[in-house]
Amino acid sequence: LCDRRQRQMCIRDRQEVDGWEKAVNSLLEDSNTDIYVTGSNSKLMSSEISTYLTGRYISIPVFTLSFAEYLEFKKDSGRTPKELLNEYIRMGGFPIVALGNFDERSSYQIVEGIYNSVITSDITKRHNITNFDLFNRVVKYVVENVGKTFSANAIVKFMKGEGRSLSVEAVYNYLEWLEKAFVIYRCQRYDMQGKTVLKTQEKFYLADASLKYCMMGFNPKSVAAMLENIVYFELRRKGYDVYIGKNSTKEIDFVAVRRDERIYVQVCRNLPEESDREVANLLEIKDHYPKYVVTMDELAAGNINGVKIMHLADFLLSKEY
């Protein structure tokens, strides 16, 4: 590192080395080096790195495999993208699962192992959670309600109905810890009339669809919510900030904003013949930004008064938005 040429350095498992930040800061001062630091959340959450590298780092979010990446992993399978989409929806995007040729049961066992490791190391031990059963029930409530708006008060009332005592503050803590461990992702509501982000009735999405299935089992009735989950993360991967759209009394599944760009997205498993809700909600938005309805319906495609209807596979593989 003695000359001034641009170099790259990757530091793995930074949590294993005391004082790693001093070495990184020294390298940033004395060499023309791009440094990539990775590691477990068990000892240092990503959100805490700013205390070590104030103003001197960029956080790069890492998600499970996109559908395009999943296809690359399965390029020798001989199956079409739409055939593999069904597998992607059920199996999720963890690379270790995509690399193997596992059946559904084995895949969910692998994902459950990943989940248990994160919950144990990154959350329960770190935050000294003693009532693991209560914490786990809150997690399951969130998992059962992916893609639905709810509040901390709603969770407290639900727990009370099961004969469990839980404070609103504890719920907020649990949700925050799950977020910081990247198990769940918060999606806030955006008031499209007032142009403001609302702090109530948020939705949460899971880091990967397979997390729901490994805990709750695969249920065809839950697919619609998990399609939303998949689209949410595809928008995040493409660099969008993603919100739930609130327009008077109606809701838009996603308002995605990237600098001066914006798109609106409705997600539905099947597009009914009278597709009024999906399309009409979008047509009420009086601006020039692109509007999409994303569906699993094989026959749904085209354009309705400026609203583009796309199959989920085509949307996930598109580079035009």
Predicted regions located by residue number:
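Accessory nucleic acid-recognition modules appended to NTPase machines
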Residues: F102-E261
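Catalytic cores of nucleic-acid endonucleases
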Residues: G245-K246, R269-A313
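Single conserved hydrophobic/aromatic residue that forms the stacking wall/gate
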Residues: L1-I11
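Conserved Walker B
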Residues: D13-V17
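Short glycine-/polar-rich loops that comprise or flank the Walker A/P-loop
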Residues: R7, T33, T54-I58, D260, ...
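Conserved catalytic/switch belt of AAA+ P-loop NTPases
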Residues: E21-V37, S42, S50-T51
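Interdomain motor-coupling "hinge/lid" segment immediately C-terminal to the ATP-binding subdomain
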Residues: S40-S42, S46-T149, F182-Y185
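Conserved beta3 VAIK motif of the Hanks protein kinase fold
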Residues: V265
